């Protein structure tokens, strides 16, 4: 006969309670970690802002106000702005050399320090649609990034090294590629949210990275350009008055979902690269501190400095070892030392040389220093 559950049953819910507690604890831990990360980023940003000079803080404030005004204007006049974009894209599409012009612009922004790759990518989607726009953008970006890589590898190598050393992320990822320049690692790196043109120049400074591997990685990661094409294509459709509000709402949601998915994907890939970098640190392949790689010139006058005495070196710059402590118990060494002392005293009596007890030099080889000596040495004269 089945037993009915009761409040006195000690086994009721025995398995469910620990599982529930474990799930809640893990969820709470994840939430706390994310909140700590957000607070940490905010505090780091604030500390960085306060460490800047007055003119730079003023410039940042002006840029922040300008961006806020632009956002407000877009929210108010978004319909007129989208319609203007549609008109411009239609005129561009009607140009005889429109495709060549867009190809040239995308090709050129592959060379650092030029910017504007994202805007041109969305423009390709607005003007030429999803499929045609992606083909044009992929060809221009792959060829532009590869040519930029070759130019900075063979003609502007010193400039490429400066670009790599100017960014902490570039330095970290370059150390990974120096140890493992496989195609898989480079593909993950190309999917990370790094500046497009700057990464082309910085990666050229890594001699272990083959040009063919770089070209293949750019080719394999070209489908990610569909995100920019899709967003640009949907932005143009928002300006089409023939479509209903429900269609516009779907377009807006699709843009938001696409952007969120792309951000999440790049965030996950970036975290994977950070964990791989940490793995290299744990194995000791890559030094954890940049000061180990590039040198640390701070605290030159710290207490860790070793104070050397010139009397500790002979004329050939070899350190004179102190053997007194090691051979103090050796009978042969003690007898030999006594003979040297007696011989030196006999020579002194005969006037062959004169011993100065205040010059800080152990003339007899006894390892004892005069109390009035200002030098601390175990060296002796060689006659």
Swiss-Prot record:
Transmembrane segments annotated in the record for this chain: 58-78, 100-120, 134-156, 214-233, 249-269
GO cellular component, one term: Golgi membrane
Extent of Polar residues compositional bias: 1-10, 370-383
Domain notes per entry: The VTT domain was previously called the SNARE-assoc domain. As there is no evidence that this domain associates with SNARE proteins, it was renamed as VMP1, TMEM41, and TVP38 (VTT) domain.
Protein location: Golgi apparatus membrane
Its biological purpose: Golgi membrane protein involved in vesicular trafficking and spindle migration.
Biased composition (Acidic residues): 353-362
Keyword entries, A-Z: Golgi apparatus, Membrane, Transmembrane, Transmembrane helix
Residue ranges that the UniProt entry lists as topological domain Cytoplasmic: 79-99, 157-213, 270-383
Keyword Transmembrane helix carried by entry: yes
Region feature VTT domain, mapped onto this chain: 125-235
Bilayer topology term: Multi-pass membrane protein
Protein name as catalogued: Golgi apparatus membrane protein TVP38
Location of region: Disordered: 1-22, 345-383
Source organism of the structure: Debaryomyces hansenii (strain ATCC 36239 / CBS 767 / BCRC 21394 / JCM 1990 / NBRC 0083 / IGC 2968)
Highest taxon, organism lineage: Eukaryota
Similarity section: Belongs to the TVP38/TMEM64 family.
Topology feature Lumenal, residues: 1-57, 121-133, 234-248
Gene Ontology terms: biological process: mitotic spindle elongation; vesicle-mediated transport
